[in-house]
Amino acid sequence: MKISYAITVCNELKEITRLLNFLIKAKRKEDEIVVLFDKKKGTPEVWQRISELKGDDCCSYHAKTFKHHFADWKNQLTELCTGDYIFQIDADELPHDILIEKLPQILEGNPDNEVYLVPRVNTVSGLTDEHIEKWRWNVDSQDRVNWPDYQWKTNLKLNGKIKYMKY
């Protein structure tokens, strides 16, 4: 079984660096990391950082233009993945190392589950009081937004049955 760790990124240099360094060390040898970079709004520094890892066989990096629909964007990312399961992560998220270690067992032990509710550490660069008020976020003393910020994570077999939908 192969897991694709699928990541979308735009301008989160510190966050994508942290996430990629973590995943490269924590993932199994047979798993892959797939990064989809927004080439229209993304920064050259982010592309440079992820390009530094292009020679690594476990990683693939793709630059495309985000067209204002997250469902389409995440479906594009899904199509780039070659694993049996996909674990989609935003650049500003950091999964716990125990989760990554146990994920293969969780997936194999629960073959009928298509999604899992996973707490994430969510940080936002340049967060302002206006952002916090507008989005009604709670920020703790470690700058984590809405901790524990539970998100439905899609861990799907690549059978085309699960898609992100626009609404």
Model-assigned labels for residue ranges:
Residues 21-63:
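Acidic donor-binding segment of Leloir-type glycosyltransferases
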Residues 63-70:
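Short, acidic/glycine-rich phosphate-metal binding loop used to engage nucleotide
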Residues 71-78, 97-167:
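Catalytic-site signature of metal-activated, phosphate-bearing donor transferases
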Residues 90-94:
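The conserved acidic donor/metal-binding loop of glycosyltransferases
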Residues 2-5, 31-35, 113-116:
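Hydrophobic beta-strand segments of well-ordered beta-sheets in folded domains
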Residues 3-15, 19, 26, 36:
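A conserved hydrophobic helix/loop-capping motif in glycosyltransferases and polysaccharide synthases
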Residues 86:
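Short aromatic/hydrophobic "clamp" motif used to bind/position activated sugar donors
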